[in-house]
Amino acid sequence: MMLLPRQALLLLLALAAALPAAAQAPVPQGLGSLAPLSPLDNGPDHLKRYNECMTLARSEPLKALPVAEKWHGEGGGLAARHCVAVAMFEAGRYGQAAAQFEAIARDMGSDRPGLRAELWGQAGQAFIEAGAADKAAEAQSRAIELKGNDPDLWIDRGLSYAAMRAWPRAISDFDRALILRPNNVEILVLRAAAWRNARNPTRALDDAAHALRIAPDHSEALLERGFASLVLGERNQANNDFNKVLRLVPPDSTAARRAQAGLRGEQPVPPPAETQPPPPVAPKGKQ
């Protein structure tokens, strides 16, 4: 369930200093399309109208909002409400979009747990855009309760915890994602960044080295290994990695700027936490 491109989600977190510079990606063009949400009318006309509404929501969200709201008034049900939510998201009304995604998930009752998990996941992504990482993590926890075998949900919640600088929780979620998706370079790099921010350069080095055994020219993994080596006093190894990054990436890229900072001996400094993580709670029943 990857509703936003992973690189785009990193950008949304505004963690370029704390997490890999892969964050510098284009702003996402839209949330992933779901099947029509209304359990009352799944006929071909309903599906056609839903798809048309979603296309408009992504391309011209301000035009799509009144169209979707009118459709809802005509009995479009949950599918129309979902189109409203996506249009709100694309129009930058992230808090309202998150509330709408949550409301749709709740109003579905106990039906279609996989679809409800996607809706909670979309709510989490909208909360991240709204700068509410704590609410994002809560929504993502609801999604995980419904679909705990989806590694993307664990990654998303790990990124929300990273936005709160709750590094042990972020690492734990990346651990779980790696169990579900072994040897994934992207997750290894994310966990390396989390270990680095948790002041454990040895574990960061291990994850970065593992990623580089799979993808030797992965610029973010090279940066993570370089910064971990820098902390551990291995300046020659660090410089080798930073120089390799400069050969691989455009000179005006964020990765290049980070590599240049590393060559000067500078370590990335994470930004302030967006919000404080909620205290751990016992697992709830399915919502």
Task: Give names to the regions the model predicted.
Residues 22-83, 92-99, 272-287:
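N-terminal leader/linker segments that initiate helical-solenoid repeat arrays
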Residues 73-74, 107-111, 146, 180, ...:
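Structural marker of alpha-solenoid helical repeat scaffolds
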Residues 70-71, 103-104, 142-143, 176-177, ...:
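Canonical positions in the second alpha-helix
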Residues 46, 78-79, 112, 117, ...:
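Helix-start (N-cap) detector for alpha-helical repeat units in TPR-like alpha-solenoids
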Residues 83, 122, 156, 190, ...:
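Canonical tetratricopeptide repeat
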Residues 60-63, 93-100, 130-139, 164-176, ...:
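Structural signature of tandem alpha-helical TPR/SEL1-like repeats
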Residues 52-54, 86, 125, 159, ...:
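Residue-level recognition of tetratricopeptide repeat
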